A protein has these predicted regions:
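Collagenous Gly-X-Y triple-helix signature in extracellular proteins
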Residues: 1-187
Length: 187
């Protein structure tokens, strides 16, 4: 069993039934991303691009976190993570959000692009396109190529959501073996 701090950026590990990619150690914890999308969902069922109100945010920090714990994750290992909700056009009206599990921002996509595993479909980011009420449904997304775009928040048929595992402290990590189960996976 290895400690998370012993892994290098880009290394993969299993935790709570999900395979994760280590990004970097930050303060008392480590920033990680699910190696594959965990389920298909709308960003927000009411078509709002504000992460603070997002139905996906509620699910990631509710049922999905519960599923990770049911698969053996320690709930106390998930530390609070503050996300910057600055819109693509520079508006800062939404401020920040604090979560245990969140999506990547556009800034995090760019910063960790070299070690982010490619996926077969586009994924949500939490960055709004704008905070202006006339277009408050647009949310940024990233394609498997790494190119960024935007989609309406209600769209969930093809949009898959990689969960950002906030920070983890003092975790024992087991090497990945064979086929894995993913917590919270939709049928």
């Amino acid at each position: 069993m290895k400690k998370l701090a012993e892994l290098k950026p880009g290394d993969r590990f299993m935790y709570g039934g999900v395979e994760w990619v280590k990004f970097e150690d930050i303060g008392a914890g480590t920033l990680c991303l699910a190696a594959e999308p965990v389920f298909r969902r709308a960003f927000d069922e009411e078509n709002c691009n504000d992460w603070r109100k997002s139905s996906l945010r509620r699910e990631l920090n509710g049922a999905f976190l519960d599923a990770l714990v049911a698969e053996g994750a320690d709930r106390a290992a998930f530390l609070d993570w503050e996300s910057d909700l600055t819109a693509d056009d520079g508006m800062t009206d939404y401020g920040t959000a604090v979560d245990k599990i969140a999506l990547r921002s556009d800034a995090l996509c760019r910063k960790y692009r070299e070690i982010t595993p490619p996926v077969d479909e586009w994924c949500w980011n939490l960055t709004p396109w704008t905070c202006d009420a006339s277009a408050s449904c647009g949310v940024r997304s990233v394609y498997s190529s790494g190119a960024m775009d935007w989609n309406d928040a209600y769209y969930g048929y093809m949009g898959r959501s990689p969960a950002l595992l906030s920070e983890i402290c003092n975790l024992g990590i087991y090497p990945r073996r064979g086929r894995r189960r993913r917590a919270g996976r939709a049928p």
